[in-house]
Swiss-Prot record:
HAMAP family tied to this protein: EF_G_EF_2_A (MF_00054_A)
Role played: Catalyzes the GTP-dependent ribosomal translocation step during translation elongation. During this step, the ribosome changes from the pre-translocational (PRE) to the post-translocational (POST) state as the newly formed A-site-bound peptidyl-tRNA and P-site-bound deacylated tRNA move to the P and E sites, respectively. Catalyzes the coordinated movement of the two tRNA molecules, the mRNA and conformational changes in the ribosome.
Gene3D superfamilies for this protein: 3.30.230.10, 3.30.70.240, Elongation Factor G (Translational Gtpase), domain 3, P-loop containing nucleotide triphosphate hydrolases, Translation factors
Diphthamide found at: 605
Organism: Pyrobaculum neutrophilum (strain DSM 2338 / JCM 9278 / NBRC 100436 / V24Sta) (Thermoproteus neutrophilus)
Domain tr-type G: 23-264
Any one GO CC term of the record: ribonucleoprotein complex
Name of this protein: Elongation factor 2
A Pfam short name: GTP_EFTU
Lineage: superkingdom: Archaea
Family: Belongs to the TRAFAC class translation factor GTPase superfamily. Classic translation factor GTPase family. EF-G/EF-2 subfamily.
Ligand binding (GTP): 32-39, 98-102, 152-155
Subcellular compartments: Cytoplasm
Length: 740
């Protein structure tokens, strides 16, 4: 990439001049289903900026800068690049992010969307709108990111499917219709109509990233080009001419400039969605305007480990101007750090810049403690609310155990794993303090495969990886009786019951409409109006676990010294819900209610070592008396298959406890939507391929948690307990507390 660095340094003065004018900045990125051609499309854009030679664009995969990405021909991380482009006689700076399409890497997409105002959605003309297209469009719309459409691989319609010009036109209209249906379904109400793509207005482009051409309807009309001319170009061998006349980079960058809003426009509607502070305050106004002279506020979207520079935080400057040497405060971590260097990105290369104003994407060295999702501010603003937490669509549901072949390498391995989890918060790391066992959880098997590959590359150590295990959740199916938890010294008594948390409240936690640090009155009002909560109970919430969707409520009145032990009770609640009594799996959807308490007057007799076990034991007893069960993760499958093979595919799904949710048929293709337990998914790929003689496309992504069928529940609990070295029989409430 050295040529890229030279080009950029030549342009650096021009880039900094534009960076000060928000009207000439666009923050956009590619979004797509896996293999629909995002990275090849991004490479065309690099060619346009003079960063790749035209010969290699389309197959260089320059944005896939991790070696395994080029090896597997797929993107697993999100890469940033700043492009300089002239349009209508004006220079523009387009900050561009290439994101992964595979379902296992949606976490990288979530983080990238925070810095984008527009998403270039790439759709394969043959496969059309797929599950992951739906997921990324939905994620984009939740972050108020405007989507525009590029229908890629038109060459496949001509060369593989041999469609006539009329059929190609029909295929494109179908994709536009399906795409607009997603916008209708997921867009914020005020943008449902405004953001639907209108091909006649140039909001949709079509072309071939591989052959480097792209065209919009207005461009085609102006040049007098018809679908029959495009078919001719392929049949008569003058595709290169098409690429010269309508270079893809020019078409796409023009579409982005015309239809993706500049930051000072986008922030007017994005900030009220992303930030809960006072919009009429000085900082509120600066954020809405993307004011480079306002106080500094940066949203961190990702953190990467650099072998020489340490941790590099990348984010978007929403207000103010960040300079080398500035002091910055990390909200939530309550610490000040000094920015040692500021950069912009060119694929894997970082280019040092003296400053970066509002509306731009910047990389910072020196803020080692910052994490994806953090808010960095001018130290004088340490009291302002941070940006909304990022909402990850997929959860880590597959786990592997990692063991170094040489025990002396353990510390180095653990250190490198901690760095991986910082870079990718959708990974989950657990180290058993007693046994030293290392457990790494990810969204899917591919996610873990890539993580362990990176681990090997970075540490150069040998280690073994166990076969994948599924992560489960524990929950309850009814309300328990009240149970008494006694502290070990018998001087404190706490009384709890548990019950299932209703789905509406779980959704309010998931969408962050209610949060732990929210004003209790505001939270109580939302719970009363949207989930039918009792007013007193809603005001009594002490803690919300937004990772596994549990909460604890205080329903006591007038208990002496309760306030002094509140934090210890909350810690005991978190301890209990992290690993439940059935099989030490995390609890999900649990409402814990404290009804009464007797607290010792002497602080020496009511410390954490007394209160936490009393809380945990009472919660465990309550859970075991409330018809506990195991929840298993289900995957959603989108299948496209030749109609002749529907029967064979259905029988494969039935064999694996799969359930068909929906089926539609067109002349060439049947479309099936199904659900399948992750537990049953490991061999399904080969079986589906064999059943349909290879004539099948499908994609899988996390769907939901569902109770395990009663017929296999007892066996599964025994298996899980055995694997964890626990006694096989399920404990009784009286194993944790005295009968009450």
């Amino acid at each position: 990439m050295s040529s890229a660095v030279r080009v950029v340094e030549k342009q650096l003065d021009e880039i900094l001049a534009i960076a000060r004018n928000p009207a000439q900045i666009r923050n956009a990125g590619t979004l797509a289903h896996v293999d629909h051609g995002k990275t090849t499309t991004s490479d065309s854009l690099l060619m346009g900026a003079g960063l790749l030679s035209p010969k290699v664009a389309g197959k260089a995969l320059a944005m896939d800068y991790v070696p395994i990405e080029q090896l597997r021909q797929m993107t697993v991380k999100a890469a940033n690049i700043s492009l300089y482009f002239e349009y209508g006689g004006k220079p523009y700076l387009i900050n561009f992010v290439d994101t992964p399409g595979h379902v296992d890497f949606t976490g990288h997409v979530t983080r990238s969307l925070r810095v984008m105002d527009g998403g270039l959605v790439v759709v394969d003309a043959v496969e059309g709108v797929m599950t992951q297209t739906e997921t990324v469009v939905r994620q984009a719309l939740e972050e108020y990111v405007r989507p525009v459409l590029f229908i890629n691989k038109i060459d496949r319609l001509i060369k593989e499917l041999r469609l006539s010009p009329q059929e190609i036109q029909q295929r494109i209209l179908t994709i536009v219709k399906d795409f607009n249906a997603l916008i209708d379904m997921f867009a914020p109400p005020e943008f449902k109509d405004k953001w639907k793509v209108d091909p006649g207005k140039g909001q949709m482009a079509m072309g071939s990233a591989l052959h480097k051409w792209g065209i919009t309807i207005p461009m085609a009309q102006k040049a007098g080009i018809k679908f029959s001319n495009i078919v001719d170009a392929y049949e008569k061998g003058y595709v290169d001419q098409l690429a010269q006349e309508f270079p893809l980079y020019k078409t796409l960058l023009t579409m982005i400039i015309e239809h993706v809003p500049p930051p000072n426009v986008a922030q007017k509607y994005r900030i009220p969605r992303l930030w809960r502070g006072d919009l009429n305050s000085e900082i509120g106004k600066a954020l809405l305007e993307a004011d480079p002279n306002g106080p500094t506020v940066i949203a961190v979207s990702k953190v990467n480990k650099d072998p020489h520079a340490g941790l590099i935080a990348t984010g978007r400057v929403f207000s103010g101007t960040i300079r080398e040497g500035d002091e910055i405060y990390i909200i939530g971590r309550k610490m000040k750090k000094k920015v040692l260097q500021t950069y912009i990105y060119m694929g894997p290369s970082r280019i040092i810049v003296p400053y970066m104003p509002a509306g731009n994407i910047v990389a910072l060295m020196g803020v080692d403690e910052a994490r994806a999702g953090d808010t960095l501010v001018d130290p004088r603003l340490s009291e302002i609310p941070p940006f909304e937490k990022m909402r990850y669509i997929s959860e880590p549901v597959v786990t592997v155990a990692i063991e170094p072949k040489n025990p002396a390498e353990l510390a180095r391995l653990v250190e490198a794993l901690k760095d991986l989890v910082i870079e990718d918060p959708t990974l989950d790391l657990k180290i058993d303090q007693e046994t030293g066992q290392i457990l790494l959880s990810g969204v899917g098997t591919l996610h873990l495969e890539i993580a362990t590959w990176l681990l090997k590359e970075r540490t150069k150590t040998e280690f073994t990886v166990s076969p994948p295990l599924i992560r489960f959740r524990e929950t309850v199916r009814e309300r328990s009786q009240v149970w008494e938890g006694k502290s070990p010294n018998k001087h404190n008594r706490l009384y709890f019951y548990v019950e299932p948390l209703d789905e509406t409240t779980i959704e309010l936690i998931a969408t962050r409409e209610i949060t732990e640090d929210q004003d209790p009155r505001e939270r109580a009002k939302i719970l009363r109006e949207k989930a039918g909560w009792d007013a007193d109970e809603a005001r009594g919430i002490w803690a919300i676990d937004d990772r596994f969707f549990n909460l604890i409520v205080d329903r006591t009145s007038g208990i002496q010294y309760l306030r002094e032990i509140r934090d210890y009770i909350v810690q005991g609640f978190r301890w209990a819900t992290e690993a439940g009594p059935l099989a030490q799996e995390p609890m999900r959807g649990l409402k814990v209610v404290l009804t009464d308490a007797v607290v010792h007057e002497d602080p020496a007799h009511r410390g954490p070592a007394q209160i936490m076990p009393a809380t945990k034991n009472a919660i465990f007893a309550a859970v075991l008396s409330a018809r506990p069960t195991i929840l298993e993760p289900l995957m959603k499958l989108d299948i496209k298959v030749a109609p002749d093979y529907i029967g064979a595919v259905t029988s494969v799904l039935n064999k694996h406890r799969g359930k068909i949710l929906d089926m539609t048929q067109q002349e060439y293709m049947a479309y099936l939507r199904a659900e399948l337990p992750v537990l049953e998914s490991f061999t399904i790929s080969d079986e589906l391929r064999a059943a349909a003689a290879g004539k099948i496309f499908w994609s899988m992504q996390f769907s939901r948690w569902a109770p395990m069928p009663e017929s296999i529940l007892a066996d599964m609990v025994k298996q899980l307990r055995k694997k964890k070295g626990l006694k096989e029989e399920i404990p009784k409430p009286t194993d944790f507390v005295e009968a009450f």
